Structures are given as C-alpha cells and as structure tokens.
Amino acid sequence: MALKTFNPTTPSQRQLVIVDRSSLYKGKPVKALTEGLTKSGGRNNLGRITARFIGGGHKRSYRLVDFKRRKFDVEGTVERIEYDPNRTAFIALVSYADGEQAYIIAPQRLAAGDKVIASEKAVDVKPGNTMPLQYIPVGSIIHNVEMKPGKGGQIARSAGSYAQLVGRDQGMAILRLNSGEQRLVSGICLASIGAVSNPDHANINDGKAGRTVWRGKRPHNRGVVMNPVDHPHGGGEGRTSGGRHPVTPWGKPTKGKRTRSNKSTDKMIMRSRHQRKK
C-alpha cells in the first residue's frame, strides 16, 4: 500500500497524507460476520464522562474478527482484503473448505486467492498461517500472539506491528516485542506468521481537525490552558509551564508514570521495555 498526497488546493489538502486503499474490496462486509456498534460518547451507564474527548464520528458496524484461529487443519482461501473502521490493520475474509467464513487480521503480503491454515502441529511458515510457538522457527516474525492458551491473540495486532521469536527455554517461547520488551510466553500459545498489514498507517497526516472528528475524537484541551478550578495545571499570569510534574485533572501523576501492577506476571518479563534500548 502506498501513501496518497494531494494538490494544495486548501491548507488542509496541503498537509493531507492518507493510505491508498484502492486495492481493497469496495463492497459491504459479510452481514453474518458483523454486529451493530452503539456509540457511548465516552459515557458510562450513569451518563457520566469516563473517557474524555470521545464523541461523534462516522457510524460503524463491528466486524467479528477471529483472533483465536482454532479451526484446526481446515484449509482456508482468502476471498478478499477489506478495510475495517474499528482497527488500524486491514482484515481478510477467509472461506474454509467446509463452507464456513471468518475474518482474520491480514498480515503483510497476504492477497486474495492465498491459502491459509491453522494447526496444533507444524505447518508451512508463510503469512497468515497459525501454529503453536513451539513449532515456529526461531527468528520468525509473528503477530496475533496469545498470552494464555486458547484466549486468542493479544500481542501485535495493530497496523504494521509484529513480534519476533528469539528463543525457547523449558517449554516457553522468548519474544521480542516492538517496545523492546522481551518476555516469556507458553510454547503452546498460538501465533500467526508475518507482520500485520498497513505499515504506512504510521505515516498518515489527517491534515485538519475535522478528519480527526470523523474518527470519533473530540478536541483535546490541555490542563495548562484551563483555570485552577478545572485542572491542577491551570491558572497563572500569562503562559506557564504548569509548575509541577504532569498530572491528570484529578491530580494523579501521568505522562510516563508507570501503572503496571500485575506482580504475578513480572517473572515473565525478561527485559523491561523501560531499559535503555540497545
């Protein structure tokens, strides 16, 4: 996929850089594999804002994507690659030999007509195939990696992302993630071969605030431009720096403050993403 730029007929067109999606399927998604999606506007069941700066945006239908890939040893054919408004990656419609259909995350270099298969045994190392980490060759680029067997892929699912299998140790697989973290995952967890599609997503420029609003994001107001009644960083004469380490509107440290608290899985992390990247 290439990037598209536009003639500078307006200031926002001058800045605009988007992904060229002309090669994707142009019709509607498979109705049996979609669900309705209700907008929350960032509000909970009491009507109170629990996630700020969310609201509006184009209406979406939710595509049911198969992250588990537990249809073992049944070959599937990729019918088409589709756009999915609910994620940054593209999705692939797979038709299996028994007539069933499913959406999967499309890896790079997967095209219509390609064959994919998931198995509990070793299968070909080619994009879209899924097998346990214990059978994947060391050094392979993988995505949609399970953290618990049978739970479905959780690691490396967004556009252009991937993990690398760098070793094995006593039934565990050692993964290197995009963040620089190295961690252990059970060797019986499933993973798919290849890197996730749409790597150019990192290079897009919306060009104008309105295009961001179409995505359901509202204007994000900085605390430093508010009044003291509204934010700990507010107030002061003229422009100020906030006068303290960054905090949320409720006074909790933010911007780099570590929030991880799951001590039971600390032992699975061999190298923290916070260590200096070599």
Curated annotation (Swiss-Prot):
| Assigned GO CC terms | large ribosomal subunit
Where is the region Disordered? Answer: 218-278
Q: Per the record's keyword annotation, is Metal-binding included, yes or no?
A: no
Gene Ontology terms: biological process: cytoplasmic translation
Signal sequence region: none
Please give one Gene Ontology molecular function term for this protein. structural constituent of ribosome
Pfam families (UniProt xref): Ribosomal_L2, Ribosomal_L2_C
Question: Quaternary state and partners of this protein?
Answer: Part of the 50S ribosomal subunit. Forms a bridge to the 30S subunit in the 70S ribosome.
- Give the protein family: Belongs to the universal ribosomal protein uL2 family.
**Name of the protein this chain belongs to:** Large ribosomal subunit protein uL2
Tell me which species this is from: Rhizobium etli (strain CIAT 652)
Which gene carries the instructions for this protein? rplB
